[in-house]
Amino acid sequence: MAKAANIKIKLLSTADTGFFYVTSKNSRTKTDKLSFRKYDPVAKKHVEFKETKIK
């Protein structure tokens, strides 16, 4: 059985609120870490979210 191309990742807020989004990415085409500017409802503003591993 072949290894799956898509893996689940966690986007953790850089505002240190502990809030995170879970999404997936294609690990073969996107080898670098993802970084998005999304809404953090705990901080009540848009902040940068960086990719971390799901533990």
From Swiss-Prot:
Matches recorded under InterPro entries: Ribosomal_bL33, Ribosomal_bL33_CS, Ribosomal_bL33_sf, Ribosomal_zn-bd
GO annotation, cellular component aspect: cytosolic large ribosomal subunit
Coiled-coil annotated residue ranges, if any: none
UniProt xrefs under Gene3D superfamilies: Ribosomal protein L33
Keywords on record: Ribonucleoprotein, Ribosomal protein
Any matching Pfam family: Ribosomal_L33
Domain of life of the organism encoding this protein: Bacteria
GO MF term (any one): structural constituent of ribosome
Any GO BP annotation: translation
Protein family membership: Belongs to the bacterial ribosomal protein bL33 family.
Entries under HAMAP family matching the protein: Ribosomal_bL33
UniProt-listed PANTHER family: 54S RIBOSOMAL PROTEIN L39, MITOCHONDRIAL, LARGE RIBOSOMAL SUBUNIT PROTEIN BL33M
Protein name: Large ribosomal subunit protein bL33
Lineage: Bacteria, Pseudomonadati, Pseudomonadota, Alphaproteobacteria, Hyphomicrobiales
